A protein has these predicted regions:
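Histidine/acidic residue-rich metal-binding segments in metalloenzymes
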Residues: 163-332
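C-terminal cap of metal-dependent C-N hydrolases
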Residues: 347-350, 404-453
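Short, acidic/polar
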Residues: 102-109, 160-170
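Metal-associated gating/positioning segment near the N- to mid-region
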Residues: 78-143
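N-terminal metal-binding scaffold of metallo-dependent hydrolase/deaminase domains
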Residues: 1-52, 56-62, 66
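A glycine-rich helix N-cap at a beta->alpha junction
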Residues: 142-156
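Divalent metal-coordination and catalytic microenvironments
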Residues: 11, 31, 80, 91, ...
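His/Asp/Glu-enriched, well-ordered alpha-helical/loop segment
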Residues: 229-257, 304, 325-326, 330-332, ...
């Protein structure tokens, strides 16, 4: 829906710069927040003059048209709803090009909008992978056809082979948001160092999938109770910490903006904490599944709870929450990884790793982090919107006058049951669960791109 002026009244705004949410009304004009009116004291009502200005009519006529304006969607009554900056996810797989039977950019964007996301950063492990200008141009052009903002990382190495760096400078000029070979760990230390140095010069983040295959017998299942249950070797925490330790040292050496992707172990969290204390420009992602579940889910849910890195022990889950709480981990990212039902129905050692997450992320953040007292509302939104946008230089993550009107309106207590998905895929361990947090509207650039039916 395209409207030059949109009013949102009676909402509760979550602004990460504020200590607590506050009641206010918003006015949106031409894709930006033009006015915020705090409700301090007397209840604010959208004035007849304001509506008259919007409609080009006299005040009396505007008063008579108020109900009609509401019905047409020009005024949103957000009573009971929270208004936050549109969520931003910097670790997403839309499988396009190459694997569009799992997801494509259009269906992925629709799933993102339903989950409250207005900004997505795609990973580059498609087919062909995003190591060249043509594939990058394809992804960005298709992204512009959706209702949300879609950026994309490009590969660090050609063909994701870990041997030769891509033309990082040229790809940066063509619109790359950052660099990653996510899905494949980079084992050549000298190559990683050079990549960091070049990324720093380009002022772009470089992200790393930290699992050393030398330690791993079977991906996706933790070496512990879960691997014992399946009688397999599994994947130990050392696989992660080995590469995290190396890359944090290189981050200190090069000064690059380094992102440790989908952190899963208490040891890695502590390593990141120490590196930050030393002054490294390092960032870490936590996925909702890693701060919610443990390896017990892999035993109970099977391949629906198989992902890389795997779900770990309760001590690891609690360490991730502590890291989110004290700022060691500054990004919540879904690692949305769609797979077909046929693929996930394979035996645990053969099924691909990964779960979808865009439509459940906000609810899990509410239940696991806010309702349990680990994060305040502003802190949750900081990690799900403001911090990701800041790191990648994206517009968004703010609710203030003149800011882009990228917003999510949701009811924090209303519950919903995880069942059908907008995504093409349904590989989620949360199916059947009742979760808090229902998205009513997602607004991107002043346009309503999702509205609860």
């Amino acid at each position: 829906m395209e409207e030059s002026i949109l009013y949102i009244k009676n909402g509760t705004i979550i602004d990460p710069k504020e200590n607590r949410p506050y009641k206010a009304d918003l006015q949106i004009e031409n894709g930006r927040i033009s006015r915020i009116i705090r409700k301090e004291g007397e209840h604010f009502k959208i004035s007849a003059d304001a509506l008259a200005l919007a409609e080009g009519k006299d005040s009396l006529s505007a008063v008579r048209q108020d109900n009609a304006a509401l019905a047409e969607g020009k005024v949103i009554d957000a009573q009971g709803l929270m208004i936050a900056p549109g969520l931003a996810d910097t670790h997403v797989h839309f499988r396009d090009p190459g694997f569009t039977y799992k997801e494509d950019i259009y269906t992925g964007a629709a799933a993102a909008a339903k989950g409250g996301f207005t900004q997505i950063v795609l990973m580059a492990n498609t087919k062909p992978c995003v190591d060249n200008e043509d594939t990058l141009s394809y992804v960005l052009a298709k992204g512009k056809e959706t209702g949300i903002h879609i950026a994309s990382c490009v590969n660090v190495t050609k063909g994701m082979a870990g041997k030769e760096l891509t033309d990082m400078e040229r790809l940066s000029e063509r619109g790359a948001a950052g660099f990653t070979d996510d899905g494949i760990p980079l084992l050549n230390e000298e190559l990683v160092r050079e990549a960091m140095e070049r990324a720093k010069k380009l002022h772009k983040p470089i992200s790393f999938h930290e699992e050393n295959p030398a330690f791993i017998v079977n991906n996706g299942i933790n070496r512990g109770r879960a691997s014992a249950f399946y009688h397999i070797g599994g994947s130990p925490g050392e696989a992660e910490t080995d590469l995290v330790k190396r890359d944090l040292e290189l981050a200190l050496l090069t000064g690059a903006d380094v992102v440790i992707q989908h952190i899963s172990t208490k040891e890695a969290v502590e390593l990141v904490r120490r590196a930050k204390e030393k002054g490294a420009s390092v960032h870490a992602e936590a996925t909702p599944h890693h701060f919610t579940l443990t390896e017990e889910a892999a035993i109970e849910k099977g391949t629906l709870a198989k992902m890389n890195p795997p779900l770990r022990e309760e001590a690891d889950r609690l360490a991730i929450i502590k890291g989110l709480k004290d700022g060691t981990i500054d990004l919540i990212a879904t690692d949305h990884a769609p797979h077909s039902r046929e693929e996930k129905d394979r035996p645990v050692t053969e099924a691909p790793s990964g779960i979808i997450g865009l439509e459940t992320a906000l609810s899990l953040g509410i239940r696991e982090l806010v309702e349990k007292g680990h994060l305040t509302w502003p802190e949750l939104i900081e990690r799900m919107s403001t911090s990701p946008c800041r790191l990648y230089g994206l517009e968004g993550g703010r609710v203030e006058e003149k800011a882009a009107a990228d917003l999510v309106l949701f009811h924090p207590q209303e519950r919903w049951t995880v069942s059908e998905f907008t995504s093409k895929s349904s590989n989620s361990p949360f199916i059947g669960e009742s979760l808090p947090g229902v998205v009513y509207y997602t607004i991107c650039g002043g346009r309503i791109v999702y509205k609860k039916a």
